[in-house]
Amino acid sequence: MSSARSFAARRGLYGGGVGLALLLASCATPPPARTLACSDALAPDIVRSADGTKASTTLKVLTFNIEGLGFPARSGRAAELKQIGDRLAAMRAAGTGPDVILFQEMFSGAAKNAVAASTYPAIASGPRRTTKASGPAPEALPGKAKLKRGEVGMHVTGSGLAIASRYPVLSTQMRAYGKRACAGIDCLANKGIMLARIAIPGVPTPVDIYDTHMNSKGASKAPEPRHLAAHDRQALEASEFIDSTHDDAFPVILGGDFNMRHSESRWENFSKYQSLNLVHRVCADQASGCEVRMSWDGDEPWMDTQDLQFFWDGSLTSIRPIRVEALFDGSPDSPQLSDHDGFMVTYRLEWPTSADQTPTC
């Protein structure tokens, strides 16, 4: 082996030229962006209660990590990603698709094209590669940064986040997680959290919808104390971002890939900062009235997945999950096209008919 090749090997899979390859691949295709005028938005079906005092509608939200890593981290994904975009477009055309999709790992050109091919009229993306983190840098993480596991002090791709909606997006905000809030290979992506404020015609308030992708565990190649501390800092930053951007009058939904499967320590840390209602916990209670159309094992099904959704009422418009189901899970009519299943929640939004019906956009 030549000395040059030996040096490249010592740098590890994600060092040197590999990082450059990821950078070039991520820059080749810009993330999709679309806006929908309020005048062009179609209103959902709105139902009034028998006594006429309440009105309600439903909102279907899908969170989906589409495994859109670029070469050389992944290869041969273009066909599956194209199927994802085509199937989402077909579901939307048939009226069976989600109203809002929270995407993660929209890194490669094929992944960005898949999101665009979903045909949703409003699409916004999260932190870009060059989006700066905010706030003072905390102390260093436990252990030492290692070049061979991607802790190179720079990002080679953006966050991979995107939100697609059938309804207008009134505004967006985003936050990249801090430089000392990532561990291992995850540091190559500028992970963070984003907000899309959605206006639903006929609903008296917007809905604040957040999307995030948090630091992985073993896949990060970082030691546990280091990746656990990074995840804890991201949980705190996500909570701070929601607190600073959310309007208490509006219902809130938080979804994404939280990388907390089978990790009591991550759940414990996350719960210190986040008091939103967990959809899995609510729907696991048979008395909740939430229909479960997926396979759940044990008393704590949220421990068996990375893909989660949380929610909270607004002061005027309430929200609760009424159905959960898996998409792209390998069932006969929904082939598995990613290393994650899609997790779709149908929420019921409800408000008093006496509420001010001033258009939200």
Regions of interest found by a model, annotated:
Residues M214-A238, H262-K272:
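Active-site-proximal segments of metal-dependent phosphoesterases and phosphodiesterases across multiple
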Residues K60-I66, I84-K112, A164, A196, ...:
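Active-site beta-strand/loop signature of hydrolases that rely on acidic residues for catalysis
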Residues L69-A73, A176-I185, M214-A229:
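Surface-exposed cleft-lining segments at the edges of enzyme active sites
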Residues S3-G17:
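Bacterial N-terminal signal peptides that target proteins for export
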Residues T130-G150, K179, A183, H227-A229, ...:
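Surface-exposed intrinsically disordered loops and tails
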Residues T29-S49, E240-I253, F258-C361:
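Metal-dependent phosphoester-hydrolase catalytic domains
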Residues R48-V61, L161-S171, L188-N215, Y347-L349:
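Beta-strand-turn-beta hairpins that frame and shape the catalytic cleft
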Residues G15, G19-L20, L24-S118, P127-K148, ...:
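N-terminal, active-site-proximal structural segment of metallo-dependent hydrolase catalytic domains
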